[in-house]
Design a protein with these regions (language model features):
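A transmembrane-helix-recognition feature enriched in membrane-embedded lipid enzymes
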Residues: 2-67, 112-117
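Soluble extracytoplasmic domains of inner/organellar membrane proteins
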Residues: 130, 137-138, 145-147, 151-164, ...
Length: 265
């Protein structure tokens, strides 16, 4: 397993990580109690709960989000994938439903959060997973919620887009829903001694999750930038030509990566 970098920043940064870990636990207690008391049963209610949770967490941890364009109100949203923080950012911007790999269900913290929010988990290679994805997407759209997924299938260090997988994209196209591209990236607005976006914000490879989260919580001035395409992707390929459709989708996200106009929210 790839080792995390030595804890940098000294005692002050370490104590900040401890404090924000306690604060994060308090958020889970607060919103967990709300979940138990209100018992949201519909997809819309659960998505609204996740939206409030994530928006509150970003404010509480002083994470700034800048956007260009608008979150699509319906259909599917696809984006590059850098970190567990991506999930929090997109959910904070708009109520939505995620389609994600089954392993995410067992992630500490985020696994519980996304499960309670009605995430559609997909076990690749298992029989019936494609049908489950398609029916889950359709149910979300029928409830008036956009569906979010990351076609790279895993996180990266952000140097370049990984090849897009075609499975979930084919299921989205098979329902006839529009698919809109987005691009997310991170930067620091304040100095963080020895920290880098690649090692301390992006979560990729075989980095151990809990040590990474602890270090992440000690950072200051994290700034997320999200760009949304102006309109859904005009696919030439259909669900039956899913590999070609995946390349078209990747090109749409890459186009956003190459642009640089943002508005702080």
């Amino acid at each position: 397993m790839r080792r995390m970098p030595r804890f940098r920043g000294g005692k002050v940064v370490f104590l900040r990580s401890v404090w924000y870990t306690v604060k994060l636990c308090a958020y889970f207690v607060r919103f967990g109690v709300e979940l138990l008391v209100r018992r949201p049963r519909t997809r819309q209610a659960r998505a609204e709960w996740l939206h409030r949770f994530c928006a509150s967490a970003l404010r509480g941890f002083d994470i700034v989000v800048s956007i260009e364009g608008e979150f699509p109100q319906h259909g599917a949203l696809i984006a590059n994938h850098l970190s567990y923080l991506d999930i929090v950012v997109f959910a904070a911007l708009h109520p939505c439903v995620y389609c994600a790999k089954a392993e995410m269900e067992h992630w500490p913290v985020l696994g519980w959060m996304t499960t309670m929010a009605g995430t559609v988990y997909i076990a690749r290679g298992r029989g019936g997973s494609a049908l489950k994805a398609k029916s889950g997407m359709q149910a979300a759209v029928d409830a008036g919620l956009p569906v979010v997924f990351f076609p790279e299938g895993t996180t990266s260090n952000g140097d370049e887009l990984l090849p897009f997988h075609s499975g979930l994209l084919a299921q989205a196209l098979g329902t006839g829903m529009p698919v809109t591209a987005a691009f997310i990236q991170y930067s620091f607005d304040r100095k963080n001694a020895g920290a880098t976006i690649v090692e301390d914000v992006s979560f990729w490879g075989d980095m151990p999750m809990l040590p990474h989260i602890f270090r992440f919580l000690g950072l200051r001035g994290i700034h997320a930038t999200v760009r949304f395409a102006e309109r859904p992707i005009a696919f030439v390929s259909d669900a039956k030509r899913r590999k070609s459709a995946a390349r078209e989708a990747q090109a749409a996200v890459q186009e956003l990566a190459d642009s640089d106009r943002t508005v702080e929210v």
